[in-house]
């Protein structure tokens, strides 16, 4: 299957018109035979891509003390408890942050306050923070999340996720696609039988089907 994925990725990149910006490569997945009105059937998975996403991933860490100091070297923003409370009083700023940031990480001790101040904003977006336990290394956690994508169907049968960038090697992108397909097959109730079709495409290019 790896060769067929690589062929599809290569075609998608080769057939894409030349643009004056760096395009991403996305995977579109069409599901079937699932009642997505039932939340238990929806896809909501974090997947670490072996070749990386090909783009910068925006990450915010909620932390204090030594953890906050270490996070400053790797995270895009580090927010304290006081700044969290300020966001809780400013819905517009909180919504802007939630829309701009890909992933949030928080010390476990701050999760209750995050739920209180930002739960209604982050929750529906599927962006509640990953809890950071006392023994967890914040640098390792953030570095891992730099190569992570969230695959989320919500109630839709068709959903998309980023699998790379146009200037990445086709085989690297294919490795990313393969990891996502394997995760989907392991997660879905009927495995591959719940996948109707899959396509890869650049941001502005044509869709190329990935053979089953």
From Swiss-Prot:
TM ranges: none
Keywords, ordered alphabetically: Repressor, Ribonucleoprotein, Ribosomal protein, RNA-binding, rRNA-binding, Translation regulation, tRNA-binding
UniProt GO molecular function: rRNA binding; structural constituent of ribosome; tRNA binding
GO biological process assignments: regulation of translation; translation
Pfam families listed in its UniProt record: Ribosomal_L1 (PF00687)
CDD domains hit by this protein: Ribosomal_L1
Protein family: Belongs to the universal ribosomal protein uL1 family.
Record's function text: Binds directly to 23S rRNA. Probably involved in E site tRNA release. Protein L1 is also a translational repressor protein, it controls the translation of its operon by binding to its mRNA.
Subunit structure: Part of the 50S ribosomal subunit.
This protein's name: Large ribosomal subunit protein uL1
Species assigned in the record: Haloquadratum walsbyi (strain DSM 16790 / HBSQ001)
Biological classification of the source: Archaea, Methanobacteriati, Methanobacteriota, Stenosarchaea group, Halobacteria
